[in-house]
From Swiss-Prot:
GO terms, molecular function: NADH dehydrogenase activity; oxidoreductase activity, acting on NAD(P)H, quinone or similar compound as acceptor; quinone binding
Signal peptide positions (record): none
GO biological process: aerobic respiration
NCBIfam families linked to this entry: PRK06076.1-2 (NF004741), PRK06076.1-6 (NF004745)
Protein's recorded name: NADH-quinone oxidoreductase subunit H 1
The keyword Kinase belongs to this UniProt entry's keyword annotation: no
Compartments, record wording: Cell inner membrane
Length: 341
């Protein structure tokens, strides 16, 4: 009995550490996003609350929490309040299987990629529920856009990940990182043999997380604020937090799948969690820069790219990877390169 309680307490403590990391990272993500956007527009950004404005995000969070929760007439109250909670919880849940270093993972399961993909796919239900429960046409249109958009690009993301699974022979994220270890540092990582898929994964991640230039579910110029129109205070904060956590999750997946996770890019330097966090921060910087400099796509353009460009290309890449790996084309060179064989 004591042993079982000890295991439960250990898991609970590890879970709290993961949640603490995600929530602390969230503060810096919002701050960094605003600072980068301000720098591109030749503004100063947050600079009043705390040193260099570092506590501005804390002040904004406190403001949201203590504001009145305004509930419009005619909404479905249980679903209205459940929707942001679903989006937030599912975004945090996926971090349970993200490894930061050998042994630094809450649950090192052999179907980690499938778990992350399932959790991120279910987030769309929070958006749909929020749009439908608001009893307003603008949130409902935004939620429908979100559903179509996420379904369209999840297919491409899944096919891209299948190529990595074929190369590794495992869906365990730790095994995928270990398969990229080698004497040539960053040239052993999967970004090189899977180079076309790196760009596709990055763009699909933007669309999957409703990030500019694909933020059509909350297009201010068309739908006011999309599915978030009727939300205020803490429910709105949960939606926003879930979005940023999902973005950071995509940064972690890019680091693990293509860029060696915690592996050092330079042979001889020690591996560790520092490299993992640094890579995630770099990819978030790219996300923020795209938001600041790329104009929003039209909805028909977004759907056309997803179904007529990304889907055929990613499907063809899976077939090519499987063919090269199975039949040892080029004397098995590609298989040895991508699989460490």
């Amino acid at each position: 009995m004591n042993s079982g309680m000890g295991i439960i307490l250990t898991i609970a403590a590890q879970g709290l550490l993961v949640i603490a990391f995600v929530m602390i990272s969230l503060l810096f993500l919002v701050y960094g996003d605003r600072k980068i956007w301000a720098a591109v527009q030749l503004r100063r950004g947050p600079n009043v609350v705390g040193a260099f404005g570092l506590l501005q995000t804390v002040a904004d969070a406190a403001k949201y929490i203590f504001k009145e929760v305004v509930v419009p007439a005619g909404v479905d109250r249980p679903v209205f309040f459940l929707a942001p909670l679903i989006s937030f919880v599912l975004a945090v849940l996926a971090w349970a299987v993200i490894p930061f270093s050998p042994g630094w993972v809450l649950s090192d399961i052999n179907v980690a990629i499938l778990f992350v993909f399932a959790a991120s796919s279910l987030e769309v239900y929070g958006v749909i529920m929020g749009g439908w429960a608001s009893n307003s046409k603008y949130p409902f249109l935004g939620s429908l856009r979100s559903a179509a958009q996420m379904i369209s690009y999840e297919v491409s993301l899944g096919l891209i990940i299948i190529g990595i699974i074929i190369s590794t022979g495992s869906m365990n994220l730790s095994h995928i990182v270990e398969a990229q270890d080698g004497a040539f540092g960053l040239f052993n990582w999967y970004w090189l043999p899977h180079l076309p898929m790196v760009a596709l994964f990055f763009i699909s991640a933007l669309a999957e997380t409703n990030r500019p230039p694909f933020d059509l579910p909350e297009a201010e110029s068309e739908l006011v604020a999309g599915f978030q129109v009727e939300y205020s205070s803490t429910p709105f904060l949960l939606f926003m937090a879930g979005e940023y956590i999902a973005i950071f999750l995509m940064c972690a997946l890019m680091s693990l799948l293509f860029f060696g996770g915690w592996l050092s890019p330079i042979p001889g330097l020690p591996d560790g969690v520092f490299w993992m966090v640094a890579k995630m921060a770099f990819f978030f910087f790219l996300f923020a820069m795209v938001k600041a400099i790329v104009p929003r796509y039209r909805y028909d353009q977004l759907m056309r790219i997803g179904w007529k460009v990304f889907l055929p290309f990613s499907l063809g890449w899976v077939v090519l990877v499987a063919f090269l790996a199975k039949f040892e084309v080029f004397g098995g060179f590609w298989a040895r390169w991508a699989m460490g064989g």
